Amino acid sequence: MKKVRKSFVLLLTGLLAVLILSACGQKTQQDIVAGLDEKAKEYTSYKAKAKMTIETGSEPQVYNVEIWHKKPSLYRVYLENPKKDQNQVILRNENGVFVLTPSLNKSFRFQSDWPNNSSQVYLFESLVKDVQNDSDAVFTAKEKKYVFETKTNYQHNKMLPTQEITFNKKDMSPSSVKVMDTDRKVMVKVEFSSFEFNKQFDKESFDEKKNMTLSQMDVATSAKPSDTFAVKTPLELPLGVKLLEEKDISTEDGKRIIMTYGGEKSFTLIQEKAQIAKASSSVTLNGEPVNLGYTIGALSDASLSWTYDGVDYLLSSKDLSKEEMVTVAKSMQGQSSK
């Protein structure tokens, strides 16, 4: 009888131990968020590579992205569109925030809080922040991944309210990000191919002049923009706004198209062939870099400028909000009959 009782006690103890160990192995959502927070605090730097696909316009835009970050505030994001033979670099260093366009030997310098002012799909600390800030985030644990569905924090784009962020269980690094519109259609997808924490950088890694020179080696800077270009018109306009006038002006470098829109609100849209600067030039703006889906633009209170496919664009308005300017620019995929 004593042997039976002893065996029963041992069996019960073993079962309890298994249950306790099993319970300990099942981490809660709060545990994972705490783990992400700890990871965000402990790393000193990282390097990552990813493919970013943006479903805007008539066809998807695919970018190769390389991300460098060194705490507390050094950033380098290299964006390459192989199909268009076009690249841009977003830098943040002690001199400010820069958007470099190496193929044109041009750069914009911003007085900006980028990247802290909105969600950034390719920055680890921004993704962790979005998870932490959403008390209603939906969490799913998979075999090798942790998946969060959270709200986004885009200042000038309310049409992309939701994102799905997937982290690797092994080291908490991001695996993928899917940003969805109000119909839950994936509009932006980032797939990380590599992510390494605590990497070493030299002193020139985040220098604007050094990055301009290195990036120029990756594009055919000797290839001049075409003398002609297809004039584009926005596919999305604010309610009650229409095209009032279109002027074609001859310049030393070709033509300049000036479109005037009016109605409930008004704005002017200028398009002209982009010129390669003879010497590296930098323009300082009181604004911020903004992702238009197919290129990085320079956004201020009353204007939005960008370069794409060898053409310079300038949208200026005292009536449109920043969000409206971004919406108009993002829809510049239509072709006029010119």
Curated annotation (Swiss-Prot):
Biological processes annotated in GO: sporulation resulting in formation of a cellular spore
Stored InterPro entries:
LolA/LolB/LppX, Sporulation_related
Q: Which domain of life is it from?
A: Bacteria
Which stretches are transmembrane? Answer: 8-25
Subcellular location as annotated: Cell membrane
Topology within the bilayer:
Single-pass membrane protein
Outline the inducing conditions: Expression is controlled by a sigma-E-regulated promoter which needs the sigma-E factor for the binding of the RNA polymerase and subsequent transcription.
* Keyword line: Cell membrane, Membrane, Sporulation, Transmembrane, Transmembrane helix
**Where is this protein chiefly located?**
membrane
* Cellular component, GO annotation: plasma membrane
PANTHER family in the record: SPORULATION PROTEIN YDCC (PTHR37507:SF2)
Q: What does this protein do?
A: required for efficient sporulation.
UniProt-recorded name of the protein: Sporulation protein YdcC
Query: From what organism does this protein derive?
Result: Bacillus subtilis (strain 168)
Q: Which gene encodes it?
A: ydcC
